[in-house]
Every structure is written in C-alpha cells, then in structure tokens.
Amino acid sequence: MMQQQKPGKPKKINRIDKIKRLQINRSRRPDINQTVPSPLFYVRIVVTWLGMVSLDAMTGFRFELLWPTWLMIRAAAESIQMRNQHCVTTIANPTAARFSVLFICVTATSDLICYLFIPIRMLIFLATTYVWISLYYHTQGGFLRSLATVYGGERLQSWPIVFITCFIVIFELFLRIRSHPILISFFPNVAEYAGVSPVWPRSLNAFFGAHSIGYPVILITVSMHYYFNEWKLRRKQCDVSNRNEQLFRILVEGLPAEYEGPKDYTSQQCLEDDLYYLDPPVQTLQPMQAIQAASATPPTSSKKNGIHKRNGDVTSSTTTSSRKKKHNGNSGFNSTPPNDKKKGKSIRDVDMDDGDDSDDDYSYRDTSSSTIEDQRRGGGISIIRFIFSSAAWLFSFVFESSTPSENSLSNQQIDDDEDYEDGDGDKKNGRTDSMTSTTKGRANTMPSTTRSQNNNNSQKQQKQSNGKSHHQHSSHQNNHQKSNGNSNGHARGFAAVRDSSHDTNASNETDIRSMSRELESLRSEISSRRSQEEDFKLQVSMHESNETRLSQQLSNMRLKVEQMEIKCSSIERHRESDKHQLEQAERKYADLLGKKAEIEATLSAERKARMEVTSKKYDVAEHQRERERQLESEIDKLRIELKSKDESNMRMESELHGLRNYKEENDIDSLNMELRFVRDKSHQMEESLAGENKLKQSLFKCLGDARDTIKSLERRVQEFQIKNGSSIGGGSSETLMNGRSSTEANNENDTTASDQSSPHQHSAMGSPVPFAKMPLSVNVSNRHGSPFNGKVSPIASIGSVLAAAGGPAPPDYMMAVGANVTATTGPVPQKQPRAGFHGISRYNEFTNIASGGEHRLFDTPASAISASAINGSNPEDDFLMNKGKFGAPSQPAARLA
C-alpha cells in the first residue's frame, strides 16, 4: 500500500527559543529544587557561625548585625551606578531599592522606633535571629524560594532548611539570651558572660539591631505595596479583556459565517503561529492522493473549538467528533495550526498513548515530561500565585458581579459541544473504532469551503435520483463520505448521466447516438465504480488494520483497568487500616490532651520558679557591682579614718612619751601629796560654802520673824499711846519714833547688804539673780563694836532690838561661821573680842578683807597663811610657779628637797 510522504515544511522556531537567545547577558537565578547543597556548603556555614559566636564571646559585639547595613550600602551604591529612576523594591530583589531622601528618612524613622520601644534583650534576639535565618535563606535562593522548597520540594532539600531554622531560633533564645551561665562554663574568662561587659558593645548591638529590624520592615512594606498595585493592574487588564471579548463576539455574530463550525469570540494578537489563519484555503487533492493521505491519517477527527487568550497566555481547547476528542494533527491538508499539535498533546496522559504510532509521539512525551517537571518545580510559587488569585477572586466577588461575556462564552462552548457530538462514538484515549468516525475524520481534514460544496452536491444528487438502487447507493455513499475528492468528481459525472437519461426517457426518443452516449457513460460509470471499489477495498483494509490495533489497545486498557482495580482494592484496604489507626490515634490524642493539661500545669509552675531563679541570677552581677561600689566608698572612708587615727595615735604616743619622760624625771609621791592637798582644800571650801548657805537661809528666816515682831510691837505701842494720852505719851513716842527710824535704817542697810550677796544665796532664797558673775560678798560691818569697818551688820541691829525688847540676841555671823568651822576642823586659837560682845567666841580666818567691809569666801585662811609664813613662802604661789606642762610639778625632786 502506497503512502504519500509529507511535503517538506520549513522548521519553525519557537518563541521561547527566541527569547532565550535574546537573554545573552542577563543573570538568571537557579530554579527551585535544582541542586542539593553539598556538605562543603554546610561546613562553610558552620565555620562562619562559630567564628561570629567566638567574636561575640570575646568582644561582646555581634558582628553579624553588620550584614543588613552592608546590604543597604551595596544597594545604595548599585542604585547610584545604575541610575535607574524606575526601580522598584521587591522581596525577591531587595538590592533594587530606589534610594531617595524619603526612603532614607523612613528607614531611619523605623530604626529609631525599634531602638526606643523594643527592649534591648528582645531587640538583639530578634535582630540576630533574623540575620542568621535571612543569610541562610539568601544562600538557598531567597526567602520565597526557600519556603517553596519546604512546602513543595523534596525532603532531601526541605529538611535541612527546617532543621537549621529551628536550631538558630533555639540557640539564640535559650543559649545566648537566657542562659549565660552555660556559656560561662565554655568561656570562663570572657567578660561578657561574667556580667562586667563594657558599655559600648551593648550600645552598638542595640543600634545595629534596630537597623536589622527596621530596614527589612520597610523593604517588605514597599514590596507589598508594589504587589498590591500590580494586582490592581492585572485586575483592570482582566476587566478590559473581558469587555473586548464581549464586543468582538457581537462583531463576529453580526458578520456572515464563511464556514460551518463554532465561532471564535476571543480576541487575540497576530503571532507567528497565527499566520496559518491568514493563508488561503488549501486546494482539493486528486482522488488517489486523497486515498493515500487518508491511509496515512489516524482514524481520529478533531475540530478547533476556540482559542482563549488572557494576559498574553494562549491556550487552545479541542473537541473530537465523538465527544471532545483530542486533536492529532497528522493530516496532509494542514487544516490545524502548527502549534495545536503540541498544545493538544500536552494535555494527554503518557500512559494512555503507548499504542500510538504517530510521528509526534516522541515530541509529546518530551513536552509532557517537561511540563510535569515544571509543575513540580513551580509548586511553591504556584501556592503564592494561588493565594493572590484567591484574594483577587474574593475582591471581585465582593465588589463586582460576573460579566455577561464570560457567561456567553461558556454557553457558546456548551452549544458547540452539543452540536458536534455523536451518540454512537465512545471516547477511549482520543480514538474510535467505528467506520463513521473514520470517514468523518477524513472529511474534517479538509477546509470548510470544500465541505460545503460537497454537501451541496450530495443534496442535489439525492433530489434528482429516480429510485434506482445503484444510484441510491452511490448517493448514500457520497452523503456518508462528505468530503472525499474522488467521490466529489464521480458525483458530478453521475449527476450529468442521470440528467441525460431522464431527458431521453421523458421524450421517448430511442436514438442510437443517445444510446451510444449512454453506453459510454455507463462504461465510464463502471470504470469509476471499479475505482471506487478499489478505494473501498483500501478503506476496508485500513479499517481492519485499525481494528487490530484498537483491539490491542483494548486489551492493554483492560489490563490497565485490572491493575487499577487491584490498586483500588489495595487502597481500600489501606484506607480501612488508616481509619482504624486514626481511631486509635484519636483515643491516644484524647489521653495525651489530659496528660498535656497536667504537664502544662506543672510546667507553668516550674517556669515561674525558673523565671524567679533566672531573674535572681541575672541580678547577681548588678548586685555585685553595686556592692563593690559601696565597699569601695566604705574603704575610702575607713582609709580617711585610719589616717586620722594614725595622726591622733602619733600625737598620743608623743604625749605618752613626754609623760613617760616627765615620770622618769619627777617624783610621783610629791605629786600625789600636792594633789591630795588640793583635793582637801577644795573639799573644805565646798563644806564652808554649804554652811554659809544654810546660815544665810536661817538668817533670812530670822529677819522675817523680826520684822513681824517689830510690826506687832509697833501696833502695841500705838495702842498704848492712844490709851495713855498726853505728855508721857509724847516723850515716849518720840523715843519710839527715833528707835523706829533707826531700826528702819538698819533694815535698809541690811537689805542693801543682802542685795550685794552672791547669786547662790539669792537663788537659795528664791530671789532673782541681778548679776550672774558677781563674786560672793557679805557685809560684816557693825556699829556696836564690830571689828570690821564700813556698813552696819544686820545681825547686830537685830540683836540690839531684841535686847531692847528684853530677849536674847541671836549669834553673830562670824560667830556662827567660826562655830561651824570649829566643829569640823577642831579648835583654833581665837582673838579676844572687843567690848560689847562679851561671852561670844568668834572665829575669823580671813585676813584679806576689802576696804568697804566685804571679803571673799575663797580667800586663803589665816591658818594657811601662818603655815606658809613659817616656811617663808606661799604654797599656792609655789604650786603655780612649779606647775609643769600637763599640770604636774615641773621639779618634784627639788620640791621635796
């Protein structure tokens, strides 16, 4: 069986290949899940991490916080060099930021807010954790690519990312922030963990930590703003595209249809693959060529249902004559676009195309495998796209209703499918085993204009048939084939023969010429029938081969169905076992929830206790520093006191040394004797002063009694004068008046004398003290033979009054003092009293008497003067002259001698 080879076609270059050729100097990022990191990569990361931790332990400054600052400086330098004023910040490319004054001000404000309102420990923890995680994700291709790898990638690549992320967070939280004592065991000499770290590393850590948090926050905010604007732009483009499709549909419906088939309502650009639609229709082949082309064509038929273009992505949907069968595209008439073959092939399943021997099997397998691989790689990015698309759908559902263009498109597609489906065919892997579908597939490989002409010819033949069996059979075959080139030519010739025979039968003319012509026409018809028979034989053989092939495919499909049933049964068994395990797991989960509640209660109590313990541990260093400052201040005070004590000790030692020298140079016995003498003298003076005070009190008491007595006597005298009367009373009254005046004068003298007495005497009597520092003085003058000159003694005047009254006179002041001293010290030699004081023994040991009649109580007594006169010197003067530096005698040995 001869088959015509396909004419050579120029090889078309795919648009993707052209785009790849244009990307000469563009840097391209590696695809997700492309390579597995080598162990050397992890060794480098671990070495870098250990180096940074060691530097932090030695200096107290975290050098990893300088990395965001370095990124910002590098981005600024690149933006200045590129001078791209329309550069947009994205999460995937943060170095492409548009550095302006506003951007720098916003970044500085964000850093300042983080520095002021976040605690230092939390700030350093967040900054360090973010830097290490960001650095690791940066080496893995970016934050989004790492998340996509974790979600949709292989376990060999996702597990290291999860493990390293958890390790960084746990290490920063539980070892570097909360448990310095653990690191002290490894670094005992580090000042950072001992609690005495300097101030400047902590300040720098807080500063760069604030920048490490504030700068990424601004980048993410700007990126989200960019993505939101991009989403709004895409949404607007979608609305405009739907509106254009609606208008284009109205325009197409208003124009006359040039072919039978579904109408394309979708607007699309004129691309390289769309040039097919601008070419003129292909001419009909010769009958033999059509048969050979049909023999080379698989028994499938398809029609283009529509091309839907949205946002630059062109997708094609094809339907088969049975029920939306897939397009094969190997016909010789080139009735489908060039790229429809690959686009239709990419939808099939690889396992369902094992028995297909077409020319595009290998290309289909390549494209399908590459499509599956691309879908596997783009799993993580598709999640993000799905999130954005779901958000866009939600916004469109809330704010806008569905457009009528989409409803009209869906309804039109449903109508097209209903018009072109056949109830006899069954869809199995895009192929059918019926002869009708085969002939229809051959008919569908021709242009629409040829099909319309053939259909019209077949309708004319059916109308002009006269009931002959072979004519009806030929017309039925022509109507059943619909676009075969051989049948079309035979239909035209046979219609002309029928017309001529009908004319001859109608006119009843039996002409030899007409019969000869009819004979020739019958011969030509016989030859055409023979050629048609050969065509049918070829078709029968072709259908037999197709039947064998389809039977093989059916057996293969049955085997696959059996395998799928076995697999389904195994899956059902696994499902039952999974249900049983799930029930057990739920029971265990309920038990674990109860245990979890108990453990959480105990854990909360332990956490509180640990927090208290850790807070105390954290405050130990501060308490130690505070205690150290207090001890230093106390040490300074004690040093000052010690210095003063040393000075006083040196002074006392010098004095002690002087006293020892004085003790060695002088006699102690003579000093003790002089000290005893001074003590005795002071004791005597105290006793004499006490006696004088008592005497003065008794004297003032007697004075008061005497005044009362005088007043009573004056009253009696006045009464007596009133009784006696004249002369006698006058003389006596004068006498009494003179006596009274003298008595009053004496009383006044006594009062002035008492006013000049010592303050101790006034205070003893309860009178005010006029002069606090006046020396004690007593007036001892007496008119009646007193040995002292000056003022009159009150004792003498009182005695004279009492003598006149006939009573005994009170003792004299000096007599009382002398009696008191005599009682205490013993008999003392007395002087003889003058006349008027007979029988009264007096004692006066005071020699230094003032000229006005006053004497001092603490003067040297006469006995002491007499004792000193014997030796020829005054002992008090000798004592004052011989007194040394510290009150001791200067020359005790000479004194004793």
Swiss-Prot record:
The chain crosses the membrane at residues 113-133, 157-177, 181-201, 204-224, 379-399. Disruption phenotype: RNAi-mediated knockdown results in defective avoidance behavior in response to P.aeruginosa. It is found in: Rough endoplasmic reticulum membrane; Nucleus membrane. The keyword Transit peptide does not apply. Residues 291-375, 403-535, 724-770 are annotated as: Disordered. Its main location: endoplasmic reticulum. Residues 452-467, 475-490 have a biased composition (Low complexity). This is Macoilin. The lineage of its organism: Eukaryota, Metazoa, Ecdysozoa, Nematoda, Chromadorea. The gene is maco-1.
